[in-house]
Amino acid sequence: MKRPLVVLLHGLARGHGSMAKLGGFLRREGFETWSRTYPSRRHSISYLASTLADEIIEVAGDRPLFAVTHSMGGIIVRHLQDPRLHWSRLVMLAPPNQGSQLAAGLVRNPLFRWFYGPAGAELADSTSWPAPPAPFAVIAGTRSLALTNVTSWTMGRRFPVGVKNDGTVAVEETRLAGMTHFAEVDATHTWIMNSPSVRRLVLGYLREGAFPA
């Protein structure tokens, strides 16, 4: 059996460097990883997915694929439906699978649309998004306020009192029918991928298809 390639997909207005520490951890554990910075603020989700699909196919060929995604990266992977992509397992970190309440509240704001672009506006409505192309797990953060997450102290107050969230995405927004595993961790949205608890869960799912006990 060919060795799987782990695709790391960053979130909106981020770059591949945001996944670097997680990628280094996975490589030390014996995995081969691939990531790149894609222009998340310039294009629609479907366009970004189409472009990434071609690049992944060129690198991976017919190898089995795993993915670890952050935030909008999870929505991108839901759109990576090209049959030439041989997905096996996916782990989504803080994905707005039900759409983003924050995006919905700000989608008509010209500054929001200018900064976050077409894809940011699309995060307001999840009704047309396809199901993930492989078995998948979801990890949600619950630390609603953190200095490292600017959104948490500028827009996080838009969440109703008592709604668990990571400062950017509500826990309930991360859930999706069909997920094989779900976990909550004490982490904020921006750097959830660097949490030791998240690393442990990701490693277990990629190796065994299940979160460790």
Regions found by a protein language model. Give the residues of each.
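Helical cap/lid subdomain of alpha/beta-hydrolase-fold lipid enzymes
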Residues: 3, 82-213
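Serine-dependent carboxylesterase/thioesterase catalytic core
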Residues: 6-17, 21, 25-135, 156-158
